[in-house]
Amino acid sequence: MELPAVNLKAIVFTHWLLTVFACMIDWLPKAYGLANITILAMGVWAIAQRDSIDAIFMFLIGLLLTILTDILLFALYFTEAEKASESGPLRDLFRFSSGMGIFSLLLKPLSCFFMYHMYRERGGEYFVNLGFITLSRDRSSYQSIEHMDPPADQDNKLPSRTY
């Protein structure tokens, strides 16, 4: 099944609009707006440099990090802001603003999926090397099943133990 072609500009514009709507009322700390606008600036960088693997990778990692920060900030500030605006004139605006922030948070994993697909299309390969664990797509050390080479060190092989 082929993935639908999603425009990077549409993703950046959607998250920008939802971030602006989420910041309409002052219920979230400035860290929310700064983090999301910074990541959207990386998205603009990825739009400007179409062949850059680094730009799309930084945007992808930034989106993943803002998922975590958004969850943390919503968990810390939502209930207090909801109580403060419950009986005030800004109740509906708070509901709209918080709804747009939550909708942005729900769209971010889907955006990350499309960003990863674009990253792979641009030629990016993700390598993880933790010393003892290596996750990569480098298959140069694999042997073909049809042409198996004999093991090199048959003489240095330890004898089997008898128990």
Curated annotation (Swiss-Prot):
Which parts of the sequence lie on the Extracellular side of the lipid bilayer? Answer: 1-28, 77-95
Q: What Pfam families does its record include?
A: AGTRAP (PF06396)
Q: Where in the cell is it found?
A: Membrane
User: What GO cellular component is one of the record's annotations?
Assistant: membrane
Span of the signal peptide: none
Q: Where are the transmembrane segments?
A: 29-49, 56-76, 96-116
Q: Name one GO biological process term.
A: angiotensin-activated signaling pathway
Q: How does it sit in the membrane?
A: Multi-pass membrane protein
Q: Keywords on this record?
A: Membrane, Transmembrane, Transmembrane helix
Q: Which residues lie on this side of the membrane: Cytoplasmic?
A: 50-55, 117-163
| Annotated InterPro entries | AGTRAP
Give the protein's biological function.
Appears to be a negative regulator of angiotensin II type I receptor-mediated signaling.
Q: What is this protein called?
A: Type-1 angiotensin II receptor-associated protein-like
Q: What is the taxonomic lineage of the source species? A: Eukaryota, Metazoa, Chordata, Craniata, Vertebrata
